[in-house]
Amino acid sequence: MAWYWWRRRRRRGWWKPRRRRWRRRRARRRGPARRHRARRRSTDPNAPRETPRSKKKRPKKTQIQQSNSEDSSPGSTPVKKQKTKRRRYRRARYKNNFSSSSSSSDSSESSSSPLPKKSSKSGGGTASTPYYLPMHKQGLYV
């Protein structure tokens, strides 16, 4: 019939949850260590704590509220600081939007005057500043 040990185990109510033994749990809670701690604790509120504290230190709520509402009036809620979004494709914008004819003319103009001029020739490109070569490559074209 049931030659295999795993089949026999399954038939004996494996789906029923086991009963918890409450007596043992309560006995653990009421151990001698807990009574010991309660006895040691001093009544003085300014005395240092003997019980171990958690390693994470939480900032107190009163300190947070004071720091946020320094400038604002007491009735108003503190203003949230917004993080500025990073512009991801700033450098790529200038590399892709220039035409070869305008960049060569801009580079010749910029050598005579210190400020870069806005060229009207840029064929519909939205880039206002010309593309400059890196320092180690500039010697090739001058």
Swiss-Prot record:
Region (Disordered): 17-142
Compositionally biased intervals (Polar residues): 62-76
Disulfide bond sites: none
Compositionally skewed regions (Low complexity) per UniProt: 99-117
Compositionally skewed regions (Basic residues) per UniProt: 17-40, 80-94
UniProt-recorded name of the protein: ORF1/2 protein
